[in-house]
Regions:
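A ligand-binding cleft/hinge motif common to bilobed small-molecule-binding domains
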Residues: 80-83, 95-106, 152-155, 176-209
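Short beta-strand-to-loop elements that line the ligand-binding cleft
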Residues: 70-77, 143, 160-168, 174
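Extended ligand-binding regions for polar small-molecule ligands
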Residues: 57-66, 125-126, 132, 145-147, ...
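Ligand-binding clefts/hinges and TM-proximal coupling segments of bilobed small-molecule sensing domains
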Residues: 148-165, 203, 233-265
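Extracytoplasmic small-molecule ligand-binding "clamshell" domains
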Residues: 29-96, 105, 164
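Ligand-binding cleft/hinge of the Venus flytrap
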Residues: 46-48, 60-68, 131-137, 149-166, ...
Length: 265
């Protein structure tokens, strides 16, 4: 039976209204722009096709699903993440970032999602056994610019020579070649770099300073911060972090247990 003109107009109004509502919903929920430096496996890295992958990438996608928003990964230098957040270039930082009082002065942090700590990658040629051996004349310490290891060395190792380098790989190379006594970095990073350089380095995996990683948010964005914290609590309760460890951190978890070091999750 043919539709009347009135019925046709009614249907058109319905479809137009539905379309406009859909457009409005999309506009109200833009992609969640997540900043990270894709140079820290297995947390932040790229696959063989150049696409982001790793623990932090999976965590970001789970957060996006919880919020009902698509996720857009923004690859930025680590020391450029906070400036990008403050200027609105990204919505949050999820990049193995330690929550420190210094950083909390310029950005807000979520609840901690991972316990970490500063450790050492030591040259096989060096007599350094712990952080207590670093602050001595003649010692050379490699640190990555903008990290908590950089901050620690600046504040506590004035007698040593501190090499501030832009790349993690450059710090590791200095140690592996015997040009630096030690590289100060987090547990997972130290483990990964020792695993690739076992003949020329040795790890000190027991943290000499406890730290926690958290998600960075723009100051005053309390609504998003509350949603992120709710997600983290639910994700932990549902076993999400255990699943991430089983997917990405099997060898690390086993090695930590072997050495009697508490695991990060």
């Amino acid at each position: 039976m043919a539709l009347t003109l009135r019925a046709v107009k009614s249907l058109l109004r319905f479809f137009v209204t539905t379309f406009l509502l859909a457009i409005g919903a999309c506009a109200a929920e833009p992609p969640l722009r997540v900043g990270m430096e894709l140079q820290f496996p297995p947390f932040e890295m790229r696959d063989e096709k150049g696409q982001p992958k790793g623990v932090s990438v999976d965590l970001a996608k789970a957060l996006g699903a919880h919020l009902g928003r698509a996720v857009e990964i923004k690859n930025l230098p680590f020391d450029g993440l906070i400036p990008a957040l403050k200027t609105g270039g990204i919505d949050l930082i999820l990049s193995s970032m330690t929550a420190t009082p210094e950083r909390a002065g310029s950005i807000d942090f979520s609840d901690a999602y991972l316990k970490n700590g500063l450790c050492l990658l030591v040259s096989a040629k060096s007599d350094v056994k712990s952080a207590a051996d670093l602050n001595r004349a003649g010692k050379v310490i490699a640190v990555k610019k903008g990290t908590t290891g950089h901050l620690y060395a600046t504040q506590n190792c004035q007698q040593a020579r501190v090499l501030v380098l832009d790349k993690e790989t450059a710090c590791v190379l200095e140690v592996a070649q015997g040009k630096a006594d030690a590289f100060i970095y987090d547990q997972i990073g130290i483990f990964e770099n020792w695993r690739r350089n076992q003949e020329t380095t040795r790890p000190v995996l027991e943290p000499f300073r406890e730290e926690s990683w958290a998600i960075g948010l723009k100051k005053g964005n309390d609504d998003l911060r509350a949603k992120v914290n709710a997600f983290l609590a639910e994700f932990r309760k549902s076993g999400g972090f255990d699943k991430l460890a089983d997917k990405w951190l099997v060898e690390q978890k086993a090695e930590f247990a072997k050495r009697g070091v508490p695991f990060v999750f």
